[in-house]
Amino acid sequence: MSCIDRMSIMGIRSFDNRSRESIQFFSPLTLIVGQNGSGKTTIIECLKYATTGILPPNTKGGAFIHDPKICGEKEVLAQVKLAFRNTNQVKMICTRSLQLSVKKTTRQQKTLDGQLLILKDNERTTISNRCAELDSQVPLSLGVSKALLDYVIFCHQEESFWPLSEPANLKKRFDEIFESLRYAKALDQIKGLKRDQETQVKVDQATLTHYRSDKERAEKIELRVHESLKRISCIRSKVEELDQEITETARLQDELFKSTEEYEQQMITIRHLESQSDIINTTINDLKSQMTITDESSEDLEKLHSNFAEKVKEEQELYKSLEKKRSDLESLLKSRRELLEKLTGDLGKIQGEIESLEKLKVKKSTMINEIVHRYNINEINEEGIMTEVSKYASLVNKNYEISSGKLKERQVAVRARIEGIKAHEMFLNNRVSEINSSLEKQLTTQKELRSRFEILFPVKLQREDFTKDVEKSDLWIKSLRQEYESKNLLELLDKHQTALSSVENRLDEISEIVDSYHKYSGVRTKLQVFEENKTNKSAILANQLMTLKSSFSEVMSYELKDDDNYNEELDKLVEDVRKKLQEKEEAESSLRSVRERLEIRISLSVQSINDLTENKKIKTKTLKSYSGTFASMISEIKALESEIEENRKTLHSLQFGSTFYEKAIEICVDQHACQLCQRSLDKEEEKLFVEHCHSMIDVIPSKSAEVYSHLETLTKTFKNLSEAKPIFDEIELLDKRLSETKTELSDLQGDLQGLDIRKDEIQSELDTLYLRRANLEKLQLLVKDISNLEEEIRTIDRETEVLRIELPSSIAHHNLDEIYAEREKLLEKRGYLRKQIERTKLEETSFKKKIDDAVLANNEQKLKLTKLNFQVNELEQLEKDINKSSEDCDLQKKKLLEVSSKQGSQAPFLNELESEYEKLEADIQEMAQKSRTEILEANEYLHQLNEWNSELRIDVSTKFKCIKEKKSNIGEEVRIIASKIESTDDNLRKLQERLADLRTRERNASDNLRLRALMRQLEEAVTQKNYLLSQQSHDDRESFRERMQILKSKYGALNAERAGLLGECKQLENSITKDKEELNMEFKDADERFRRQLIKTKTTGKANEDLGKYAKALDVAIMQLHSMKMNEINRIVDELWKQTYCGTDIDTILIRSDSEGKGNRTYNYRVCMVKGDAELDMRGRCSAGQKVLACIIIRLALAECLGVNCGILALDEPTTNLDEENICSLAKNLSRIVEFRRKQANFQLIVITHDEQFIRLVNSDAYCSYYYRVKRDTNQKSMIVKEPL
């Protein structure tokens, strides 16, 4: 059971928006006392708003929130917090927040996000922040409905008389409290659902029969598919066996192909070996003609060759070391020469520095003379002169400090007098500003008063106009009431309700007729389904017949007649196509065999071309250094031979000439005669002859080296060309064989192309036959479908005839469409009448609202008239305030004139003092500038002399001598290095000559080794060729061909048998595909659909029966619950009335609930009072006190009966309009109720009253120790104070 714990209020009504006021609710009784207007009712309003989210009545425009004008703010935030325990005794906190903003002309109230917290196990969990969710969650947590919280538990004082309100409002509130409309709507929905489900059950029965037929047909198709799959499995196993035999046959063919390929390869190898032998023989002959054959063994030649290589390597290493040595010497020579050039430059620089120092001495002497004359110095010593200059600078600085100090003292005194005068002026200015500010405020106030006066000035005229408007409004209200009485809206409403009752009775009769008609709806539904199926299948049959005829004419080029036997005709055509296919497939297999043989020969030719081309590339790479033809190479070899011979002769002649000239000189010196002519020579001729011989001897070595080098080049070229000649022979032979092989390949490719053309023709004919066979097979399947459809139509006709016999003839007399049409018209009429009733009610409500609005507007006008009277009084007061303000302004203006006259009197004296101050400042600046200039000049002289002295201390002559000596040593090193380079060059020339002789001897040994290697290669090639020729004689080439033909025949036969089996398998697969397509398209999930429909039909039938039972039980339960609750409520009301009411005019009161329509589930409510046997409506016949007492008692009874989970009840001013006896009686009854319910843990009675005597009568000190007093503080803010009883 739920209960409330405490609540805090902030910013609601008269409660302050800056602080919270809290109240704790006790069990079983909480008393709240306060004077009228203190804020007691606000507590009930906050409880109702926190639990339901409903604002109190008449709170539009933010009246529920603390007024911003009172607190002087533009925006006020309000908040209500309620702590309570839900039905599970879990503590929860509900927080609701509001905001009221005031703008220039409007107010805006805004509901902010709230919060619903749950506190469990010391953890805080937020359930929701949305206001809409709080409105539903809080009543749910308290265990009562929102209507019960609104109308019973936390009922507002202004709405507390609702039990005696007009019938419509009373019915609405009782229906909300009992939640009767919800149950009535649920019951109507259940019954409507039951009727709909009965119709659905009948349709489901027909659908179930149809699904059963589809299921049986699907099972037949699945059986046929299963048999076809078994046949396909057998065929595939047979095909696998054939595939193994075909693979084995292909393997044997491959082995024979490989044997044939090996034979051809051996022939190619033999031809290649013959060609290679010819090339080697040619090379051997050429090599013998160009070399000297030695008798040494190959091992000796190899050793000699390797020794040559070592010697050459040693000589080359020695040559490289000498070259490196020469390079190092050249680098050293270069660096020494660069250093020599640098030293020469340094000597020039030092010479320049010596000249600069001489000039600097002259400048220094000139400056010293200038200083002596400028400062009148008698010293001759340089140091003494610099000391005198420093003293002069110090003296100038000291004189400046003394003079500037005196001027600054005078300046400070003048400045003090200036500041005093300015302070007095500032005081006067501030005074003027204050008077001006005060004057401006006075003028602003006066302006505002005049503005307000101008605004209120038309009020007098408005008051007269409003008086006339109030009189017109009274007349308008009177006319509206007369018009409302003339329309007779209540009589019109009764008329429409009578017509609506008649229409609903006729609809009930039609529902009974439809129920009786639906007993045989299952048979009619089946007939309708069968007729639709027959129509659909007939249309499909006609379409398929047309498709069959058009397809047959397209395939066979002639039309099929209606009386033809489709199956026999198609079987004949299929057999004819099968025979043609067999013939063409055999021809295609034969062509494929021939083509395979051609491809093998082409492959061998291509391989041979590739080998020859690759061999040619290898040979050509060896000749990449020679770009000429074979003929040009022969002529070039011959030319080289003659040129080599000439160069050898020339070299021999040169070697002989050197000996000859030396012998001639010897003879000339000894015998003084010429060696050739033996003529004697005199001294002059002898001298000339010796010089000539020496010049010839000097020329011969260089000429011999030149001729030797050229001879070496010619010999190397001759050797390269001699080696290339046999390779040219091989390339010519390869070109010839390439040409022959390409010609053969071209012929084979031409034959293959012819075979391909023939094969394409046969393949085209095969494709045509395959397409025709496929079309014929499709036609066979179409004929089969047509037969199935004809059989299905005959079955439907038989089943339809059986159903027509079962259908009774009496059903035909009722036309269901006409009945439904009449029901539709009645439904439209019922809707129209209901709209008319609603429209009449709306019109009545509108008239009443119009009258109420007019009355409200009239009251507002009267209120405005009163406000205008107040404004006229305010206008008179404003006139007085304006006059007083004018007098104040005149007084302030006089004061302003007095102060202004005193301003500016000290201005001339102030100007004189400021001029004097500026003059003193200028004198100080001038003195400082002069002193700084003299000090800077003296310091500059001293600085320049110090710098020049530093430069003159450097010793340059010693450095000059050192560099000159170093330059002489470096020059000597350069000459020594140059002589070493010349010696190294002589050694390099001698070493080159030794290397040339070694290479000539090495080449001859290498040629002998190469000749012996070629001889061995020739012997190996001849041996291998003889072996291959001997092998060829043992092979029988014809046997290869016979065995190949046998294997090809077997391969073709196996493929033909395999193709036949695959064709049959293809036909079966097509048949299975068609059957599966039929299953997927027409019978997809037939079993599942039948099973689901069977389950659905059975379960829907059973569920519909249970739905009827549930509707009947719910109807009875609703009526019993309502009757039981009303009896209990009336019992409690009777008991409380008799115990409370002290008068004798009314024995008791009760609540009557009269049934409104058929079914006793809709009620009209009224409160009656009983006197003896008479029972009268209490509304309009009771006094104000009886009205208050009756409403309290009814609320107590409703809370007792319906608030089982929530024992809370709040009474706001329960003693209103009660006399003293009834107050005492009500207090005693409340005390008795508290005493009886105090054992209930969650019972909480909240009493709010201004009557403290009533509190004592309730016997409050027996149930609680404290009570709460609500009052206003000094700021007129409501506050809650806890006080002891």
Curated annotation (Swiss-Prot):
It catalyses: ATP + H2O = ADP + phosphate + H(+). Its main location: nucleus. Its cofactor is Zn(2+). Its EC number is 3.6.-.-. It holds the Pfam family AAA_23. Binds 1 zinc ion per homodimer. It is an enzyme of class 3 (hydrolase). It is found in: Nucleus; Chromosome. GO terms for molecular function: ATP binding; ATP hydrolysis activity; DNA end binding; DNA helicase activity; double-stranded telomeric DNA binding; G-quadruplex DNA binding; metal ion binding; single-stranded telomeric DNA binding. Mg(2+) binds at T41, Q157. Residues 295-365, 630-668, 698-726, 727-809, 814-902 form a coiled coil. ATP binds at R13, N36, G37, G39, K40, T41, T42, I65, D67, Q157. Zn(2+) binds at C674, C677. One of its GO terms (biological process) is telomere maintenance via recombination. GO terms for cellular component: chromatin; condensed nuclear chromosome; Mre11 complex; site of double-strand break. The keyword Metal-binding applies. Residues 630-726 form the Zinc-hook domain. PROSITE patterns: ZN_HOOK. Keywords: ATP-binding, Chromosome, Coiled coil, DNA damage, DNA repair, Hydrolase, Magnesium, Meiosis, Metal-binding, Nucleotide-binding, Nucleus, Zinc. Component of the MRN complex, which plays a central role in double-strand break (DSB) repair, DNA recombination, maintenance of telomere integrity and meiosis. The MRN complex is involved in the repair of DNA double-strand breaks (DSBs) via homologous recombination (HR), an error-free mechanism which primarily occurs during S and G2 phases. The complex (1) mediates the end resection of damaged DNA, which generates proper single-stranded DNA, a key initial steps in HR, and is (2) required for the recruitment of other repair factors and efficient activation of TEL1/ATM and ATR upon DNA damage. Belongs to the SMC family. RAD50 subfamily. Forms a multisubunit endonuclease complex, MRN, together with nbn and rad32. Interacts with the rad21 cohesin complex. The zinc-hook, which separates the large intramolecular coiled coil regions, contains 2 Cys residues that coordinate one molecule of zinc with the help of the 2 Cys residues of the zinc-hook of another rad50 molecule, thereby forming a V-shaped homodimer. This is DNA repair protein rad50. It comes from Schizosaccharomyces pombe (strain 972 / ATCC 24843). The gene is rad50.
